[in-house]
């Protein structure tokens, strides 16, 4: 697995991996002995909020950018504003890290942001609307907060990207990866809901790995001990005292609380 190198990358970025992040990195980075490159071409990650998902995405993107020359890494968010905020936070972290010498000066102009590295690779943030239906050459791309997509938009993105993956695999020798990451959404999150429901029913494609962190269906999201037991970052990024503060922020919004910290879908009932 490539997980050990991802872990070292995280340390050099100044954000050592939490146990759950290392587990995901180890599995997602498994190497196919028949090809010598990544076994999985698709990684689906469903997590509660406040768990360090963004840190893992940034670490995986950085590792992928440094895998070889002229690699193309894209981070997709619901809007351009969301993507660019995430990108600016990452660039700031990178600039202060031990990996800064490998990075060139970032381009921060609106609509044209990218972080290039000395080897010619780049990481670029985009709004999903800029990508849907368009084939883009890429080595790794992440659809973050996938709950925001309806089924048609999500499939348009995947259908546009899939043909380019074989081209890049042939050109670089490294299996491209699509990452789909999100907290559970609502009944309107038809793209993500379809994926998760299919996986939970046991219909997981051979080259897809998926991770589903959250409270069990029969658990009480108002029980703090339940949240502490099942949230992958409990006691690591925050404690029970902070959990009480988080709950107060969701006063009068029980479904929003269960969704954010239990990763439970809000079906509006």
What is the meaning of each model-derived region?
Residues 1-269:
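Phosphate/NTP-binding elements of NTP-utilizing enzymes
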């Amino acid at each position: 697995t490539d997980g050990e190198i991802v872990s070292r990358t995280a340390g050099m970025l100044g954000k050592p991996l939490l146990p759950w992040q290392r587990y995901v990195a180890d599995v997602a980075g498994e190497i196919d002995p028949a090809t010598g490159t990544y076994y999985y071409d698709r990684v689906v990650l469903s997590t509660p909020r406040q768990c360090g998902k963004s840190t893992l995405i940034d670490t995986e993107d950085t590792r992928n950018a440094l895998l070889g020359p002229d690699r193309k890494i894209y981070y997709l968010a619901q809007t351009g504003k969301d993507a660019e905020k995430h990108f600016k936070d990452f660039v700031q972290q990178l600039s202060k890290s031990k990996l800064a010498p490998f990075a060139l000066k970032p381009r921060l102009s609106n609509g044209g942001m990218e972080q290039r590295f000395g080897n010619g690779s780049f990481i670029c943030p985009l709004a999903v609307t800029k990508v849907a239906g368009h084939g883009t050459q890429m080595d790794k791309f992440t659809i973050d907060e996938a709950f925001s997509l309806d089924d048609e938009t999500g499939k348009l993105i995947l259908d546009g990207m899939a043909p380019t993956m074989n081209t890049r695999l042939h050109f670089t020798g490294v299996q491209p990866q699509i990452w789909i990451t999100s907290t559970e959404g609502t009944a309107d999150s038809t793209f993500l809901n379809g994926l998760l429901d299919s996986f939970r029913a046991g219909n997981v494609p051979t080259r897809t790995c998926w991770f589903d962190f959250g409270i069990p269906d029969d658990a009480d999201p108002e029980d703090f001990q339940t949240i502490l037991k099942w949230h992958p970052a409990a006691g690591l990024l925050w404690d029970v005292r902070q959990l009480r503060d988080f709950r107060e922020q969701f006063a009068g919004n029980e479904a929003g609380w269960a969704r954010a910290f239990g990763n439970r879908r809000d079906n509006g009932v």
